[in-house]
């Protein structure tokens, strides 16, 4: 019995679009994957970075990584939407075999047990 593959899609948005529009694109692509019957595992904003070479006269781009699993049909839907978008300057989807990656814990999202103990000691 083989495990269901998961996919990682990295896409680069134009650097000159406003932050609200970036969030709109991220939400749109995440919902597209969900509507296609797949599950979004992780969505990371990598931020604005310098490109290795100019793409469409841009030297920088806003990088976004989307990890998802499903039967593969969501990839065609997602890539078609990205291909037609003028705000996406590059995209790449890679199929990963094997176990799903562990969920990413964002630093600062959960208090450390040591910090809780120190806070209790200060209050006492």
From Swiss-Prot:
One of its GO terms (biological process) is translation. SUPFAM superfamilies: Ribosomal protein S6 (SSF54995). It comes from the Bacteria. Residues 111-124 have a biased composition (Low complexity). The keyword rRNA-binding applies. It holds the Pfam family Ribosomal_S6. Keywords: Ribonucleoprotein, Ribosomal protein, RNA-binding, rRNA-binding. InterPro entries: Ribosomal_bS6 (IPR000529), Ribosomal_bS6_CS (IPR020815), Ribosomal_bS6_sf (IPR035980), Ribosomal_S6_plastid/chlpt (IPR020814), Transl_elong_EF1B/ribsomal_bS6 (IPR014717). Residues 99-124 are annotated as: Disordered. One of its GO terms (molecular function) is small ribosomal subunit rRNA binding. Disulfide bonds: none annotated. One of its GO terms (cellular component) is cytoplasm. The keyword NADP does not apply. Belongs to the bacterial ribosomal protein bS6 family. Binds together with bS18 to 16S ribosomal RNA. HAMAP family: Ribosomal_bS6. This is Small ribosomal subunit protein bS6. It comes from Prochlorococcus marinus (strain MIT 9313).
